[in-house]
Amino acid sequence: MQISFIGAGKVGVSLGKYFISKGRKVGGYYSLSPESAAWAANFTNTKQYQSIKEIISSSDMIFFTVPDDKIGEVWETAKPYAHGKIIAHCSGIHSSNIFSDIDRTGSMAYSIHPLCAVSDRKTSWQALGDVLFTIEGDERNISNIQNMFAQMGNRTCFISAENKIKYHAAASLASNHMTAVFFMAQKLFLECGFSMQQANEELYRLAKGNLENIHAQGCINSLTGPVERGDKNTVQKHMDALDADMKNAYLENAKLLLEIAEQKNPDRDYAAMREILMPTESGEQCEK
């Protein structure tokens, strides 16, 4: 089976390079940017296709590795040539339903999402061997798609079209939103006189240790800190020291920490903490 890519960005190039490293046959790339397609073809030692018609007719499976908001548009251009093919995209949020009227072409559609951050065209492929791929799409061939990745050593998971958005939100929280939390902590360290290098290194060590605990014990058993202890005075001092934007972010996260704390310590009284984090409308803290 020959696999090719419409779109020559980070995801398409990384997948192509990875597939080749695992012995898969990759035809090459087509892109509206000839320079990008040429670079991708050279990097993977494959072909640069000159048109959508050419790449589809030469391939058995075609990945649409274009920006999420362009998948449907590019599919409309490709649809007249897609007869009896396997069509896929790598969007986390979109399902295979974005390939409209695909049944009329005799092709089968899939969304195949690598659960990882693909940040570099040259190097990200090297980490794909330890990545989970979530698969959604036409059930007639889905077991073969799963086997394709299993044979390369990847973990796979089926997901329904209805759950794609919630799944992608979860992935964004664990990846992108964690960056935002780290960024806030970094800013505070810099305000305290740490150098950027110190802030990066020491906060990384702290975050890494916590992630390792979560991986080993789960969120509930890993929770520590002032919210878990019920230390309302410390939490209040934290919020008093923050500007409005950071305070709001801290507060929303602390509410979730309180939910975890109450599960960890069901016999502990968190009423005072709850009043700080979620004061009643008539309370003094809610007055403007």
PLM regions with names:
Residues 212-267:
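Interdomain hinge/lid region at the active-site interface
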Residues 1-54, 58:
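NAD(P)+-binding Rossmann beta1-loop-alpha1 motif at the extreme N-terminus of oxidoreductases
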